[in-house]
Amino acid sequence: MEHRFNDDSLSLHTDLYQINMAETYWRDGIHEKKAVFELFFRKLPFDNGFAVFAGLEKAIEYLSDFSFTESDLAYLKDELGYKSDFIDYLSGLSFTGTLHSMREGEIVFANEPIMRIEATLVEAQLIETALLNIVNFQTLIATKAARIKGIIENETALEFGTRRAHEMDAAMWGARAALIGGFQATSNVRAGKRFNIPVSGTHAHALVQAYRDEYTAFKKYAETHTDCVFLVDTYDTVRSGIPNAIKVAKEFGDKINFIGVRLDSGDLAYLSKKARTMLDEAGFHDAKVIASSDLDEHTIMNLKAQGAKIDVWGVGTKLITAFDQPALGAVYKLVSIEENGKMNDTIKISSNPEKVTTPGRKRVYRIINQLNHHSEGDYIALEEEDVHSEDKLKMFHPVHTFISKFVTNFVAKDLHVPIFEQGKLVYDNPDIQTIQAYVQDSLGLFWEEYKRISKPEEYPVDLSQKCWDNKMQFIHDVKNKIKKELYESE
């Protein structure tokens, strides 16, 4: 089937209302106003104690290439009815703004700005949907992977979710996010090529079925592959699968690298113990027992509690789909806008207290105790505040303000780094291995109580006094303005 508009520009990866708002701004002449938006989420996923930020590399690619193609413009004009003068304006648009962001792999928490975008009102508005799409998905997968890796610890974790992912790009970028979260390899060959990450795979039940019996299938596989992992549960794991894997491994000897056996069904606790015993008795003490079959952190924790002898964990569906929480819920809110040549803060008020935004351009600092090298909490301050010059900080809960403490002898780590400055890319995103190491190093700053899988302690994310006062003043002013308008209308 032929399509008239057959290219696939990511600049149209947006909601229609973003373009509608862009046209409103442009026709009203306010499109060049400077605006500051912040991207954050309100609630940690999976009831976890932290999240792992992922998606910066994709965001960099998106912003670097942001422009409307001739096909985009033709579609907007011919199919959606936008007028020629607005189309002409869009034809010259690119991202000329500034992006400050947390590093990819940063440990992040609810209500702290992960990204801060400073651009013209039109540019900042048009990129909202794509940035949220990128960060919402990849951060969710990286966080799920980190939860699983936290249970597996030093054992190997493999990402096996490609066929169950929501589509091809989700599989590829999800594989990358899983490695950021701590996984060692993926089965996705495209992701391996695209991101230069390790790939790993065995064979399917179809191989055994094609040859009708396990011995022949394993033998043929060994004849064509040096590294061998045999899938042993096609017929009978204990009486047929494992014995035939051992038989082929002995026959081929040093001609192959017998990595181990994979279990993909049945009672994994029982079967892994049987497999370990049978492999050891056959002299294959270094052979690994690899398990898959709808695993997640909860199943893995239960298997470990039952004494399962599993060395390598292949996790697919429940990782790549973020099975128990398929959405992160990140939002993108305007916090400051230019008026009469001056930046003025802005706030969104809601009857839901958690949806009231914090006005102003802000930075996030991690307050690290220099004596025990653990984090005391994250501290959100207005851009103009010089936190590094402070010898003593008052940290207090932004809602329950009576919960407070004073911190001395600390280092304030600025979590934001410049990515784009006035449209120019100024940041070199590190490779996966470096990001992965950064995640693990960063997790070392937190007490175990914040990292446990079930009912973790709430990590402090506090506002500076100046930031909090600014927010309270805005709430007060908005309420008074509404009261005045109601009074005058009566």
Identify what each model region corresponds to.
Residues E2-K34, K43-P45, G81, I87-T96, ...:
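Buried, small/hydrophobic-residue-enriched core segments of structured protein domains
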Residues E61-F66, S101-E104, V108:
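An N-terminal, globular interaction/scaffold subdomain
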